Structure formats: structure tokens, C-alpha cells
UniProtKB/Swiss-Prot annotation:
Subunit: Part of the 50S ribosomal subunit.
GO molecular function annotation: rRNA binding; structural constituent of ribosome
Keywords on record: Ribonucleoprotein, Ribosomal protein, RNA-binding, rRNA-binding
Name of the featured protein: Large ribosomal subunit protein uL4
Gene Ontology biological process: translation
Segments for region (Disordered): 45-73
Disulfide bonds: none
Family: Belongs to the universal ribosomal protein uL4 family.
Coiled coil: none
Pfam families with a match to the protein in the record: Ribosomal_L4
GO-annotated cellular components: ribonucleoprotein complex; ribosome
Its job: One of the primary rRNA binding proteins, this protein initially binds near the 5'-end of the 23S rRNA. It is important during the early stages of 50S assembly. It makes multiple contacts with different domains of the 23S rRNA in the assembled 50S subunit and ribosome.
InterPro entries: Ribosomal_uL4, Ribosomal_uL4-like, Ribosomal_uL4_dom_sf
Amino acid sequence: MELVLKDAQSALTVSETTFGRDFNEALVHQVVVAYAAGARQGTRAQKTRAEVTGSGKKPWRQKGTGRARAGSVKSPIWRSGGVTFAAKPQDHSQKVNKKMYRGALKSILSELVRQDRLIVVEQFSLEAPKTKLLVEKLKEMALEDVLIITGELDENLFLAARNLYKVDVRDAAAIDPVSLIAFDKVVMTADAVKQVEEMLA
């Protein structure tokens, strides 16, 4: 199959298995959920009654004081006592096979092509790292909410896009399923397309 280059009167021949496969919604959902789960910190931590600092001595005798019976100053019902079901650090990551991950990326790329959300250009670069230059270039292409993928990371482009809320710049090796579906449009350079094809082959 062929992808038309927007900035040139030519087309790029690409693999049908990468850019023309059926959309597997269940697979994409599973991989996106796993990717998001892997990004969770899971570092919250509280102390149980065993971990709270304090004496193990009974605060006062069982009977005769008129006060409620108490066996420990670390009791969860006491102020500064331990937490009953204390939260502990957790690893939320889910196992995803390479074949599944690559399959999901291929599925997403194919769907982007079908929905006319993937724009392929010969090259995409800036003379200087100026946000103004990038905004003008995107305005010319009628783009606003966009992910730009280049073969090698273009520093000028990266620096110019840092200040734009709905624009992100990646190199081909750094693509992920969440970013591909998060933006309205995805702009890829011809060399980025070839790199992604090799990566997912």
C-alpha cells in the first residue's frame, strides 16, 4: 500500500501489515490499560500498628480507673495510632508480550490511516528553536492538536514545541500507544515511517 506525502508530489510504499491491518479494539484496550498501569508510581505508604513508634506497654491497668480499657497506645482507634488497613507500595505493572505490544501499535497506526489522522511528510524541521516558527508552520497545515514524529529527534523542533500545550515531538523510537491515540492528528516524516516499519516488523 502507499501513503501520500503531503509536502511532495509522490507516495511512500509501506507494509500492509503495519499500516493496513484490521483494528483490534480488545488488544489496543488491553495494551493501553497496561501502559497506563505501568506509569503509576504506587509509592503511597502508611504505618500499621506494628510499625508506629510507641511503647508496647499497656497504658493503664484493665480495671478500676473508670476509663475505657486500652491495651496499646498504637491502637488504630487512638490518635497517632497505626492505620487499620495501611496502604503499602504496590507494583501496578502488567505483563504485555512484545507481539501484543507491536500488534497494538500496528492496529493504531492502521486506524489512524483509515481515519485520515496520519499525515506523512518528506521532512519536518525548523531553522531555529522558536515557538513562533512552529505555530506558523502548523497554522499553514491547519494543525492544532498534533503529535510530530521524526526519524531522529530534531532539537529545534523539540525546543519549539515544549511551550505548546497540544503539541508533542518524539523520535520514531519513542512512540507509544497512549500518545498515538491522544492527539487529533499525527505527523510523521518519511524516515520515521520507515523506522517504525522496521521496529514493528
